[in-house]
Amino acid sequence: MEHYSLAQLSKALHNREFSSVELTQHCINKIQSNKDLNAFISLDEDQALKEAQSADLVLKNGEGKPLTGIPMALKDLFCTKRLNTTCASKMLANFQAPYDATIVTKFKQNGAIIIGKTNMDEFAMGSSNENSYFGSVKNPWDRERVPGGSSGGSAAAVAGSLVPFAIGSDTGGSIRQPAAFCGISGIKPTYGLVSRYGMVAFASSLDQAGPFAKSAEDLAMILHCIAGFDSKDSTSADRVIPDYSTEIKKPVDKIRIGLPSCFFQPQVEKGIQDAIHDAVKLFENLGAEIIEIDLKLQPLWVPCYYVIACAEASSNLSRYDGIRFGHRSKSASTLIELITNSRSEGFGNEVKRRILTGTHVLSSGFFDAYYLHAQKVRRLIRDELITILNSVDVILGPTTPTTAFKLGEKIDDPIQNYLADVFTVAANLAGLPAISIPTGFENKLPIGLQLMGKHFSENRLLAIAHHYQQHTNWHLANPNKQG
């Protein structure tokens, strides 16, 4: 049952081929037998089984929704009443929120079973999931390699078939990059499509929640459940949400694909370039029109992103002072010492680095030179992408310049870690939707293909990804069945 699609699982549960309790227990057993992946920070086994029993009663009565009785995992930065919300940080190691995030409420309303909360880079800052207070997550394809970050636990849980699907967050590539490294599908929705209420903030103008699953078809089913306006989120978009599962089944014709030459640079591994070119050829054979495009501002994507992201992080993380909530130092005799020591002890090195960087670019002598300038460049990047997307349906390229690297290989070189997001940050800067889907292997390691589309074009984006997956089997590959 672990290799069923979500639609197949839903049908089997509704037809009583197996019970939600059996499915949930199977997932719990898988998690327990794969503890070395370190994908989870917390589990809620007893409650999950209770909810599975309730789901079985609903299903027995011929009721239930598409996700009723299906277990899932949640990145540990979404607030939950029952489980701690740690953000993989010592600062919040014992924090329990008094409310559920909107996305959690929506899953409960749709009958999904939250089995636990997944490991991540601390406060979602990282590209390898090595920055966690609870230890590194390992890649199911090679346990000596990283799963990507910051949503590495969610990606590893899905890739390792521990759960049918999981939720992550994406600030600069934190859904798409782990999806690529772990050989699964993941989508960053348009900014504002999915509520951020109850999602602990890293960079508020960039953060967006989204799902991981094996296929675009599964992503469509999940996205339909979580998308929609939320009055509790001031950035939430008030739009009619289409039925993505229906939309992806419509005929896909006259696809216009933008192919940027700058995505095929020497630093992009040859195996990845070859896999992307093979995907382009397949799209051509399926009738797509390939249009070469020029992204003149692409060299500015990463520096622009890190100035803005660090600035927002330094502001958002100023609330953790050891007084209101979070870690409180026991070695302080004055208020200043309490705040200083609590933050020094509570935050890890990468979080401290980004807070310092953000504070620097926001300081009076550098605000105009760095932060204000980066915001102007951000607008130019957004305008360039929107202009190009007026003439093509999607921009296609590799999700990452490399396949998954070894644990410890880049942990002491933050610049190399940041460059793992070189192709993904633009979607966040512009608020655009983007999806990563599997498109091959290099040395038995998965390769990801990224498609970026217009604002609120998730239906088209998912349809194109689904169209590709109907003609390939990369998304069906399983790390447990490697030769």
From Swiss-Prot:
Its EC number is 6.3.5.7. Keywords: ATP-binding, Ligase, Nucleotide-binding, Protein biosynthesis. It is an enzyme of class 6 (ligase). The keyword Nucleotide-binding applies. Pfam families: Amidase. The keyword Nucleotide-binding applies. It catalyses: L-glutamyl-tRNA(Gln) + L-glutamine + ATP + H2O = L-glutaminyl-tRNA(Gln) + L-glutamate + ADP + phosphate + H(+). One of its GO terms (cellular component) is glutamyl-tRNA(Gln) amidotransferase complex. InterPro entries: Amidase, Amidase_CS, Amidase_dom, AS_sf, GatA. It comes from the Bacteria. The active site is at residues 75, 150, 174. GO terms for biological process: translation. Gene3D superfamilies: Amidase signature (AS) domain. Belongs to the amidase family. GatA subfamily. Heterotrimer of A, B and C subunits. Allows the formation of correctly charged Gln-tRNA(Gln) through the transamidation of misacylated Glu-tRNA(Gln) in organisms which lack glutaminyl-tRNA synthetase. The reaction takes place in the presence of glutamine and ATP through an activated gamma-phospho-Glu-tRNA(Gln). This is Glutamyl-tRNA(Gln) amidotransferase subunit A. It comes from Legionella pneumophila (strain Lens).
